[in-house]
From Swiss-Prot:
SUPFAM superfamilies: UDP-Glycosyltransferase/glycogen phosphorylase (SSF53756)
Taxonomic placement: Bacteria, Bacillati, Bacillota, Bacilli, Bacillales
This protein's name: Glycogen synthase
UniProt source species: Geobacillus thermodenitrificans (strain NG80-2)
GO BP annotation list: glycogen biosynthetic process
Top EC class, one word: transferase
Length: 485
């Protein structure tokens, strides 16, 4: 079986968020299952020179973008057994940032068209094209409407994964003819029209053979008005073609037994060494090195989506508890200012680093006792799984992937691997923090919790098997349709 991942970013080449981690890890796991999984992404200016040196040009062609004829170079690179194709066009991709440009609609209209135009040139005929988020949303739509009548494309199926429904790729109506070679027939509610705009995300939801999202709970949530971002009706209509498959983490990169960023490596059998990381973390943030004071951590984008309004609301009440807090992140100015001010107001209790620093993030995952993640919504979330892998117990709100990966501790049955609350309410969160702190002071309970957390499987292996089954059923369904239809 051959699968092409069409993505706008992919680790380790270009990354702005969790999508890059998925695109970097999942194809590797699929190859271990015998699938010829390859990845196609733009050749961004920001890709490190050491990667660019390893690329070799395998094709050149002209791609139509409305009335324009744009150059397209295809460069190939092999890394960890996976073949990567980079779409080269300096006009569109020689920019300092991946996204946020005035012509993102044109840039990704070009990329979607290039994905399909390039395949015959590189002589790769995938059984499935797996697209991710709005940037590649027009690939399934263009394939269905403009390419499937051609023999080369006739058997190709499409899968579209929603990583975050909030970002939809909305552009003015004129983009249809000007960039997509589509006429006014397609500006209707059953095609691309979305509240007066053209929606790349909707194009994928309408035309893909299968839609997946990144956790079973998020799959259910997005079919409701509260989480559905005005697409819940369409998603309910397509519920038979909708799957929720939980993301994994790269358990080789996030491995407390061999993590080069840690002060002290440790395993489930040597959990006492975790304390050395806690002391190092306290030292790094100028906090007193107290072993018996619980240290709560947050590694987060500082946005409202991450539930930081709850934290700001009850922060002073949190500080009345015997605890320390460490925060690493960047984002909205108001949250950056708030946490910086709180670090000054509570010296010895609060440590804050504004920005992102990979080695420090690993040290936090290893050194903290508890990890706070009170998200408003969370399609999957990776941080809670990383925390569990390092034996750091999560406190989460029951939404999306947080609900699927963290089971609240039950003192009667002794089951669970963390603590959770249901309502998006600051005092519900505060109650749950206090509950977690009470069990921290019961060593026998805490030992059980940390051992259970570290023994869990958070890898991509389980998820890759589910994707493989989904691809196989999709191909089988199509063969059945051809025979009996």
């Amino acid at each position: 079986m051959k699968v092409l991942f069409a993505v706008s970013e992919c680790a380790p080449f270009a990354k702005s968020g969790g999508l890059a981690d998925v695109a970097g890890a999942l194809p590797k796991e699929l190859r271990r299952l015998g699938i010829d999984a390859r990845v196609m992404l733009p050749k961004y200016e920001t890709i490190a020179p050491e990667w660019k040196k390893k690329m070799k040009k395998v094709a050149e062609l002209i791609v139509p973008v409305g009335w324009r004829r744009q150059y397209c170079g295809v460069e190939e690179l092999r890394h960890d057994g996976v073949i990567y194709y980079f779409i080269d066009n300096e006009y569109y991709f020689k920019r300092p940032q991946l996204y946020g440009h005035y012509d993102d609609g044109e840039r990704f209209a070009y990329f979607c068209r290039a994905v399909l135009e390039v395949l015959p040139e590189i002589q790769f005929q995938p059984d499935v094209i797996h697209c991710h988020d709005w940037h590649t949303g027009m690939v399934p739509f263009l394939l269905r409407e403009q390419y499937r009548h051609e023999l080369f494309y006739v058997d190709m199926r499409t899968v579209f994964t929603i990583h975050n429904l909030q970002f939809q790729g909305l552009f003015p109506r004129g983009i249809l003819e000007d960039l997509l070679n589509l006429d006014g027939r397609y500006f209707t509610v059953d095609h691309l029209e979305f509240y007066g705009c053209v929606s790349f995300m909707k194009g994928a939801l309408v035309a893909s053979d299968l839609i997946t999202t990144v956790s079973p709970t998020y799959k259910e949530e997005i079919q409701t008005a509260y989480y559905g971002e005005r697409l819940d009706g369409l998603l309910r209509a397509r519920r038979d073609d909708l799957l929720g498959i939980l993301n994994g983490i790269d358990d080789e990169f996030y491995n407390p037994e061999a993590d080069p960023f840690l002060t002290a490596t440790y395993s489930v059998h040597t959990r006492e060494r975790k304390q050395l990381n806690k002391r190092a973390l306290q030292r790094q943030f100028g906090l007193p090195e107290w072993d018996d004071v619980p240290l709560i951590a947050m590694v987060t984008r500082m946005t409202a989506q991450k539930g930081l309004d709850l934290v700001t609301c009850v922060f002073h009440e949190m500080m009345s508890e015997d605890m320390q807090l460490v925060v690493l992140g960047t984002g909205d100015w108001r949250f950056e200012q708030f946490f910086s001010q709180m670090a000054a107001a509570y010296p010895g209790k609060v440590g804050v680093y504004i920005g992102f620093h990979e080695p420090l993030a690993h040290q936090i995952y290893a050194g903290a006792d508890l990890f706070l993640m009170p998200s408003l919504f969370e399609p999957c979330g990776l941080s809670q799984m990383i925390a569990l892998r390092y034996g750091t117990i999560p406190i989460v709100r029951e939404t999306g992937g947080l609900n699927d990966t963290v089971q609240s501790y039950n003192e009667i049955t002794k089951e669970g691997n963390g603590f959770s609350f249901t309502n998006f309410n600051a005092h519900d969160m505060l109650y749950t923090i206090r509950r977690a702190l009470s069990f921290y002071r019961q060593p026998s309970v805490w030992e059980q919790l940390t051992e259970r957390a570290m023994r869990g499987d958070y890898s991509w292996r389980r998820s890759a098997n589910q994707y493989k089954q989904a691809y196989e059923q999709l191909i089988k369904k199509e063969e059945h349709t051809l025979v009996h239809g």
